[in-house]
A protein has these predicted regions:
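Long, charged, low-complexity intrinsically disordered regions
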Residues: 1-43, 47-48, 54-56, 68-86
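A generic structural motif
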Residues: 58-64
C-alpha cells in the first residue's frame, strides 16, 4: 500500500494517480478541495468522467487515470489545479 502523499494547505488542488491496494487498477486522487465541497465535487466529477468514485480520507478518488479530464473540469469551476506525482 502506498502512503497518502502529504499535501500542503496552499489552496492548490493536486491530482495524483495512484493504484496501491487496488489490485493494480489506477485511480485519480484529488487532494486540496475544501471539505464542504467534497461530496458535490465527487458527484460532478464521476458524472463528467463517466466512471465510479468515492470520497475517502478528505480526498476524492475517481476510477481510472482521468487526471486530464478532472483538471479541465476543476479549472472551469475556478480551482487552481496542479497535476502531481506519476
Amino acid at each position: 500500500m502506498t502512503p497518502t502523499p502529504r499535501v500542503p494547505n496552499d489552496g492548490v488542488v493536486r491530482i495524483f494517480r495512484g493504484k496501491g491496494g487496488r489490485g493494480g487498477k489506477a485511480v485519480s486522487v484529488v487532494h486540496g478541495l475544501p471539505r464542504r465541497d467534497l461530496a458535490a465535487v465527487a458527484k460532478d466529477l464521476k458524472k463528467h468522467c463517466g466512471s465510479g468514485g468515492t470520497v475517502k480520507d478528505g480526498a476524492v478518488e475517481i476510477q481510472g487515470d482521468q487526471r486530464e479530464k478532472i483538471a479541465e473540469r476543476l479549472r472551469a469551476q475556478g480551482y487552481v489545479v496542479k497535476l502531481a506525482g506519476g
